[in-house]
Amino acid sequence: MLFIFNFLFSPLPTPALICLLTFGTAIFLWLINRPQPVLPLIDLDNQSVGIEGGARRGAFQKNNDLILYYFSDAKTLYENFQRGLAVSDNGPCLGYRKPNQPYKWISYKQVSDRAEYLGSCLLHKGYKSSQDQFVGIFAQNRPEWVISELACYTYSMVAVPLYDTLGTEAIIFVINRADIPVVICDTPQKATMLVENVEKGLTPGLKTIILMDPFDDDLMKRGEKCGVEMLSLHDAENIGKENFKKPVPPKPEDLSVICFTSGTTGDPKGAMLTHENVVSNMAAFLKFLEPIFQPTSDDVTISYLPLAHMFERLVQGILFSCGGKIGFFQGDIRLLPDDMKALKPTVFPTVPRLLNRVYDKVQNEAKTPLKKFLLNLAIISKFNEVKNGIIRRDSLWDKLVFSKIQGSLGGKVRLMITGAAPISTPVLTFFRAAMGCWVFEAYGQTECTGGCSITSPGDWTAGHVGTPVACNFVKLEDVADMNYFSVNNEGEICIKGNNVFKGYLKDPEKTQEVLDKDGWLHTGDIGRWLPNGTLKIVDRKKNIFKLAQGEYIAPEKIENVYSRSRPVLQVFVHGESLRSFLIGVVVPDPDSLPSFAAKIGVKGSFEELCKNQCVKEAILEDLQKIGKEGGLKSFEQVKSIFVHPEPFTIENGLLTPTLKAKRVELAKFFQTQIKSLYESIEE
């Protein structure tokens, strides 16, 4: 006892005292600098709230009032950009770069001025500041795309994005359906295609083409011969500068853009979106982000997702409202990592297809058992921090394992949002662990301006798309023939709110199919409310689905084309939202297969021919040939097939009484073969 007393109260030697003070200081510094967890803002077990009529709203909303705008001085997309000009103090706005060079920036005022000059040129040429004045924009992402779009908004015109994957026939349809007299495009190749359509009498209403890139006199002369005026964007801006017209700003209820969906069957449909639609959707995401992430003029995003789709334009609109910067990629997705390293974005909108590539590359580089062990340990350790609300990129695991991944995306990403297609749980979990930033999954479609739900801060579970955003409600409606009922918290996802579109351009029948008399948008997706109030996508009402890259697939259309193949009796086309390509199951025609096989030098019984690899390859080649002749796009073609000797019948449960394919049953029946086909092809 005396020893303990003497030890505690006798003077300490100087070295011991220094060590004790040093240790105490280290503990104190760790306590005040240790990462602070971000606590969930809502009860994660009750993330949405039921309201009258069976719909639900996000629990973070205080009441049932849906948001219209976030900033009182930005109720239209024109005002939204002007606000960015003011709060950034005319800071850098749009950035671009050439290979191996730094980004160059165009200021907010320069963008605004150029938009006014371009719009003034259009007015000088006789086009109107009007809700039925449609202007086509046919270009890859670049600063001039935004300038052209802003020119439309500045003078109350309506932008109509066009894009390559629509195909020539669809572009002709869009130009005629929207009565587009002027198209602003980037390359002479696209302009040539537009002129050829006029020469053939296919788009007689097209009168003006404004080109961003240089073009030769021959193209100008071809245009003159068929009544199309060819102008360079530079000349158009000079004409507008010399004949300046005062801006004619739009009202919130005015149309801002017509987004034509590529569609899977029939002609494209033009979704009519107002300024209010877009601004309210932007406001909902700003409100959602408010407690954890408030964009400023210091924030920058990289523009590489197609501007023809609303996801990219929503992100840009949010950045513009806060005076942020948009840096454009060079136009080659293979150079995206180099662009990101040069730009160092803080906001990164993305899609599962790109994240899958990064994830696969990281997994493939961990070749030895030790590297795999360390990678998995790092993911588990970092994700445990994430689950506890700690978001950082300065841990030991970041320095040892994840710094290279973070660096490949610029090293400064603060916010990632993935959308357009479902993302797998392992990939989403990996990026939440590896990036040290906020990573959310969003869900929506063009008809609701892009987004209607998003995962909540603090909820790091995967396999769902979160809760309704602040501009809309969501409800599930019975789909009796598929055995989905709202009393079971299942049904077709329906959306109502300020972001729901006004209908399809000049197509009341298609509009009535998706927009009911009470204003509910019927998405065609089947959803399920999970016990915690989040929404999970479980099916499609129609046999249409998305591939991993976001392309819509109508399998029945493809099957109808493939049925023209001589050796084919029946065909089942299968795809999955986490896969980037299609596979198929083919039942050959017993009468045609022997002669078909004989032409490639193969003989045998029907069963032997079905198992023969050469026959399989020949059938696949014939399918792809028929598909190309039938107008199928490359992503609509099957990459591999399984040849099955037994036909699909009512008796074996693979056909309905009306002889339609039972797709769910077929997928289950051939699940082993489907898995094998996917595994045999490296995506």
Swiss-Prot record:
Q: Which reaction does it catalyse?
A: a long-chain fatty acid + ATP + CoA = a long-chain fatty acyl-CoA + AMP + diphosphate; (5Z,8Z,11Z,14Z)-eicosatetraenoate + ATP + CoA = (5Z,8Z,11Z,14Z)-eicosatetraenoyl-CoA + AMP + diphosphate; hexadecanoate + ATP + CoA = hexadecanoyl-CoA + AMP + diphosphate; (E)-hexadec-2-enoate + ATP + CoA = (2E)-hexadecenoyl-CoA + AMP + diphosphate
What sort of enzyme, by top EC class, is this? ligase
Residues in the Cytoplasmic compartment per record: 33-683
> What's the chief localization of this chain?
mitochondrion
Q: Residues bearing N6-acetyllysine?
A: K361
Where it sits in the cell: the answer is: Mitochondrion; Endoplasmic reticulum; Mitochondrion outer membrane; Endoplasmic reticulum membrane
| Pfam families with a match to the protein in the record | AMP-binding (PF00501)
Q: Which InterPro entries match?
A: AMP-binding_CS (IPR020845), AMP-dep_synth/lig_dom (IPR000873), ANL_N_sf (IPR042099), LC-FACS_euk (IPR045311)
Give a GO cellular-component term.
Answer: nucleolus
Segments traversing the membrane? 12-32
Q: What is its EC number?
A: 6.2.1.3, 6.2.1.15
Kindly state which keywords UniProt assigns to this record, in alphabetical order: Acetylation, ATP-binding, Cell membrane, Endoplasmic reticulum, Fatty acid metabolism, Ligase, Lipid metabolism, Magnesium, Membrane, Mitochondrion, Mitochondrion outer membrane, Nucleotide-binding, Signal-anchor, Transmembrane, Transmembrane helix
Family annotation (PROSITE patterns): AMP_BINDING (PS00455)
Q: What Gene3D superfamilies does the record point to?
A: N-terminal domain of ligase-like
Functional summary from the UniProt entry: Catalyzes the conversion of long-chain fatty acids to their active form acyl-CoAs for both synthesis of cellular lipids, and degradation via beta-oxidation. ACSL5 may activate fatty acids from exogenous sources for the synthesis of triacylglycerol destined for intracellular storage. It was suggested that it may also stimulate fatty acid oxidation. At the villus tip of the crypt-villus axis of the small intestine may sensitize epithelial cells to apoptosis specifically triggered by the death ligand TRAIL. May have a role in the survival of glioma cells.
Concerning its family, UniProt says: Belongs to the ATP-dependent AMP-binding enzyme family.
**Record-given protein name:** Long-chain-fatty-acid--CoA ligase 5
- Give the classification, highest ranks: Eukaryota, Metazoa, Chordata, Craniata, Vertebrata
